[in-house]
Amino acid sequence: MTISDREWVARHLQLLTAEIPSDVVAVTGRLVADTIAIAGYARAHGIGGAAFDAASVQFSGQGSSVWGEEAKAAPLDAAFLNGTAAEALDFQEVLINGRNNGHAAVVIVPAVLALAGQLSSSAEAVTRALWVALAANIGLGEALGRAHRANGLGFRTTSLTAAPAAALGCATLINNSLDTALAALGICASTLPAGLLSAMSPKMGSYSPDKDLSVGFSARHALHSALLAGAGATGPEAPITGDKGWLASYGAGSADTSYLETPPSERDLTAYSIKLYPANFGCQAAIRASIELGRQFAPDEVTRLHLEVKSSSAASLSTRSIENHLAARFSLPFAAASAFVRQRSVLADFEGKAVADPAVHAFIDKIELTGSDELEAAHLSRGIFPARVTAYAGENVLARVSYDGPFDGYSAAQDEAVFAEKLASLCGAERAEVLLAYSREPLSDARLRTLV
């Protein structure tokens, strides 16, 4: 028998009194720091949707923090602005899950922290709200599957799963009522601003900022749903599994309610991975491999650079028409060519005139992109985003480099070091130290106060 929506929510509320595992503390701290740094950079530089999302927003000295701005805004506006900016660089985390992968922190962190700023919530309450939301997002994603974005459909996983999960997390900051939490989930899931993937389609080629705005709307919607529930508004009793509900509407044949049975306390939050490079996650392993090969061979020594990635990434990240920064971030040919030619992959490589660099575009012609069913199967079974990159001189193999992801083989110390470097590149050394301090001590009220 399928678990009821009420019981599913009740199980998540048990996290409010459970001992917080060390990995939950570490993951939530890192995701908050990462999200804030990315959003702050995008806002300060007016990138993507952050260039104009403040239209009709009134800033003031009160309210919730807008990352990258001195002023504050009303909580709903702050959630929208921070969600939009957090998405703009495509530098955000990804849930590594073979059943369904997508972004979540870009919705959950802006919504939860905007409310925490309004309510002066404790650091422990915020950490628990994030735990609830991130665990719920995994459950919703697994139950949904990925047919919602296949066979011509284009619903974004982030819009469908992260918003209801964030609403559930926000509800726990308002009170610990099961009725409030279920209502927040139900209102959010039943009234979703369901973002579409059209902007990122190589066939469409628009690469437009509605991608960013969609995340902002989701963060705002999640918080708004929780506030309405806190005020007494109600939603369906079975918004997720019920007739004409969320799964029935978006499942598209891949829905499986058995995935909702996993206890939230058993959800592995370490499946959320930050990005090492400012491009789509499907590009990450190929970028790392291309950098290494670029340090071994000059561009004129290589006649062909063969990229093998999972077949779905080869299709969705295939564009060679690089009209703007977003197209560059969603192009395996550009990302790999840039990494090889420049022997790096940093923010500046995807901005301004760098997007039109003749040396990079000349090397794009040497990129051969192949989708591998073998690598797709590895992704589906293990959740990884592998890549094999081979440099050729004529028909002779010069070298081949393979990785399962951007952090493949890194030690804990290396992982921490590159994360610190990422934060510094986004917000400068001083702000990076503040964010790093929070990421290491997210249960500290004093650390939280520096952010909200």
Where are these regions (language model features)?
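N-terminal core-entry segment
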Residues: M1-T270, E441-V452
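Generic alpha-helical structural element
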Residues: P21, C170, K211, K275-A279, ...
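Accessory "access/gating" subregions that flank catalytic or transport cores
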Residues: E69, H221-L332
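Residue-level preference for alpha-helix termini and adjacent loops
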Residues: G139, G154, D212, P239, ...
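Intrinsically disordered, low-complexity Ser/Thr/Pro/Gly-rich interaction regions
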Residues: N280-E441
